[in-house]
Amino acid sequence: MNKNDIVTVEITDIGVSGEGIGHVDGYTLFIKDAVIGDVVEAKVMKAKKNYGYARLMKVITPSEYRVEPKCAFARRCGGCQIQEMSYDRQLVFKDQKIRGNLERIGGFTKDQIDTVMQPVVGMEHPFGYRNKAQFPFGTDKEANPITGFYAGRTHDIIANTDCALGVEQNKEILEIILQYMRENKIKSYDEKTGKGLIRHVLIRYGFKTKEIMVCLVVNGKRLPKAERLIEKLIQIEGMTSITISPNTRRDNVIMGDSYEILWGQGYITDYIGNVKYQISPLSFYQVNPVQTEKLYGLALEYADLKGDETVWDLYCGIGTISLFLAQKAKQVYGVEIVPQAIDDAKENAKINAIDNAEFFVGKAEEVLPEYYAEYEREHNGETAHADVIVVDPPRKGCDETLLETIVKMQPEKVVYVSCDSATLARDLKYLCANGYEIKMCRGVDQFPQTVHVETVCLLQRK
């Protein structure tokens, strides 16, 4: 197989990034935007010894799983990798992704996986689900400001104010901001030169409260003629918070370290279940509130709290899971590295009149081992104990020193919430080699039309 060869391929599998996989005379090709079951014509773009990457040129025979994408930019934009795949098939793909990682990385057998796996929790309406969107700003060839999303693996902006995954209010807000920029000759930020003012716009929406936040990330300290923009934005029903976040760094970090209120208050509120949360521009908050309620409900179900338990919630963010758990537990301790998030968690506990949740700032892999060692010193060698430990780590998973401490504390249950089933499988392998067994495992589709899937696992001490 050589570069620029044109080949006809039947797509027989899906890669972890959503690309179609096919074979030509035993040679494996990865083809972006091809759907399992398609027969396609593809052009080889990169040829290695045993495999290569090809560009989809034409769908010769469409798969039964191929659907018309809702967004005209689906193939070019880097946001939705599998929008041309039917939603039912997306859920099968995500289930297989979790199972594949558990088998390949975790070393679990198919029988073991079949025993514990439950079907992926999907969405009834898998579009318009995001309560948060961050739009980069740039300039077109005519020097007009544009906004949209980055093309896959680039920082080239695909101009689009109407993302199918976001709420309908996003379009109106972005059009108002673009008009304000044109009328007042305000330039978009240029990554290459470091000049220009508007870098990004963050929009948050409360699905239960209908409150809207707009935060403009600016390459400076102020927004010229801000009152003209505010006058238009506050006409949108639900507008609650308009802020700016200064960010003059020459890097890819989106938000600045702080924000200033231009109008309204510095936060919006929303609910997950019956718990109310205060969300600032810098808060971490799950982007799909419909599925988050199911995700946390599953974590609570797996924890099966009776009311007399001590629970640790590691990587607790703004206390989203902690406050859910606190309603059923005797005491909850939350740990999070971001100080602002812990401030939010404490405020959220106060808002909900929850007084049995305590929060600590620090790395989970440092705070828990330090707590364990200190407890042992102060109690004449007696070991610290937790009834349930919940972990919700970033993509890199849990540090091994943290897993060691979890095992030492001998909780009856560990509830592991994961955004990357590969690192989940690695960590489950460690826990299962050290006195635990998986009882239940289930995917929750937080991100329809993308390759990402959350997973919740219950481990029980043997």
Predicted regions and their residues:
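Extended interfacial segments that mediate partner engagement and assembly in macromolecular machines
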Residues: 57-69, 75-188, 208, 223
